Amino acid sequence: MADVLDLHEAGGEDFAMDEDGDDSIHKLKEKAKKRKGRGFGADEGTKTRIREVYDSVEQDGDEPGPQRSVEGWILFVTGVHEEATEEDIHDKFGEFGEIKNIHLNLDRRTGFLKGYALVEYETYKEALAAMEGLNGQDLMGQPVSVDWGFVRGPPKGKRRSGRRRSRSPERRRR
């Protein structure tokens, strides 16, 4: 069995303790900024978050209207034939203006289209003309539905208040 050598008994000054080291660690910890949670922004005004303003078209009435995405005006086309190609959609929608981007999702299992497409225009006028001109029209023998990809929500000033249901007979008696 091996002998165990105790360093303190052997008079080993090899491992001298730095007593000043503890003070420097405490000083560093005092200067360090305490951070908690996601983003470390608890005290730096996270409640006053800056909202980006996107272009939207003013409309009369309570209906939500179209809203511009970061890149452009996007149309959501549904009812697209599963064997349609990007060229077919480009030919049909290209009549109304310059197409900035077309996105088609394919089904991984079959390799065919999932039945919808996203068509992006630079200007509102081109997108509106395409939507009005092609909504309900046939594309490869199938009628397509064209609508805005992004819409504004309902107006914030007009909210319902109070009860939405009638009171039960038991509650009316009280």
Swiss-Prot record:
Its main location: nucleus. Residues 73-151 form the RRM domain. Residues 28-38, 155-174 have a biased composition (Basic residues). Residues 1-11, 44-54 have a biased composition (Basic and acidic residues). Residues 1-70, 149-174 are annotated as: Disordered. It holds the Pfam family RRM_1. InterPro entries: Nucleotide-bd_a/b_plait_sf, RBD_domain_sf, RNA-bd_8, RRM_dom, RRM_RBM8. It comes from the Eukaryota. Keywords: Cytoplasm, mRNA processing, mRNA splicing, mRNA transport, Nonsense-mediated mRNA decay, Nucleus, RNA-binding, Spliceosome, Translation regulation, Transport. One of its GO terms (biological process) is regulation of alternative mRNA splicing, via spliceosome. One of its GO terms (cellular component) is nuclear speck. GO terms for molecular function: mRNA binding. Part of the mRNA splicing-dependent exon junction complex (EJC) complex; the core complex contains casc3, eif4a3, magoh, and rbm8a. Identified in the spliceosome C complex. Associates with polysomes. Required for pre-mRNA splicing as component of the spliceosome. Core component of the splicing-dependent multiprotein exon junction complex (EJC) deposited at splice junctions on mRNAs. The EJC is a dynamic structure consisting of core proteins and several peripheral nuclear and cytoplasmic associated factors that join the complex only transiently either during EJC assembly or during subsequent mRNA metabolism. This is RNA-binding protein 8A-A.
